[in-house]
Design a protein with these regions (language model features):
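Structured catalytic core of nucleotide-sugar glycosyltransferases
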Residues: 23, 31, 40, 63-64, ...
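Membrane-interface alpha-helices at helix entry/exit sites of multi-pass transporters
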Residues: 82-87
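Membrane-interface helix caps of multi-pass small-molecule transporters
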Residues: 20, 24, 70-74, 133
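Membrane-embedded alpha-helical segments that form the functional core of polytopic membrane enzymes
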Residues: 32-81, 111-122, 164-174
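Helix-loop interface residues and adjacent transmembrane-helix termini in multi-pass membrane transporters
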Residues: 23-25, 47-48, 77-78, 137, ...
């Protein structure tokens, strides 16, 4: 939702506050990898109960995730593989964070936490999959209630401020709602395309 509203305006803010990133070309794929290593390590921090540290790692990795695209666009070095790599490694971070929390709650013998984080993990994977699968057929899938940026931001802030439980419930409900939104959108759009295709066949037959 936030990404849809702000769009590339984020690039301007990054240029303003971090001009040194644009002094000379940097391979954006390296920034993507660096961000993944940093944010992915949050999973280990979550597993060890260092939730504040995990939140800081997620925010730092998220910064790299914003910067890689801005750098690529600024120097005109965006590639299809870069976009693919960025999207794929985002999933790695998502899964690592939730697995870290599942491990933490399992060690603490809190089955409710394990179930809640498992639900978030499954819904997060479905959120990504429904969008990728639907966009093979329809032109564009709207983001929905909670996109990745909102999910990571909420999890990071909740971890740093030590309000993890309410944030996890927000993530669980919001992510499931997002999955349902995307499925309903795909249902409507694919139904429309099917109707148009049938109409064309009828016209051709006549």
């Amino acid at each position: 939702m936030i990404k849809e509203k702000l769009g590339h305006r984020l690039d301007g803010w990054i240029h303003t506050f971090f001009p040194f990133l644009f002094w000379r070309p940097i391979n954006p794929d390296w920034l993507t990898l660096a961000g993944t290593l940093i944010a992915g390590s949050a999973g280990l921090a979550f597993a060890e109960g260092a939730h504040g540290t995990a939140g800081c790692l997620l925010l730092t990795g998220g910064f790299f995730d914003l910067v890689d695209g801005a750098v690529a666009r600024h120097f005109g070095i965006s590639t299809r593989f870069g976009a693919f790599l960025d999207s794929s490694l985002d999933r790695v971070v998502d899964v690592a964070a939730m697995l870290g929390l599942v491990t933490f709650f399992a060690r603490a013998n809190e089955p409710s936490g394990v179930l809640l984080c498992s639900l978030i993990l499954v819904a997060t994977v479905l959120t990504s999959y429904t969008k990728a699968r639907a966009e093979l057929i329809v032109a564009r899938m709207p983001g929905g209630l909670l996109e990745r940026g909102e999910r990571i931001g909420l999890l990071a802030v909740g971890s740093i401020l030590d309000i993890l439980w309410p944030i996890l419930w927000i993530l669980a409900i919001g992510t499931v709602v997002t999955v349902v939104q995307r499925i309903l959108y795909a249902y409507r759009e694919m139904g429309r395309l099917d109707r148009e295709q049938r109409s064309e066949r009828v016209e051709e037959a006549n």
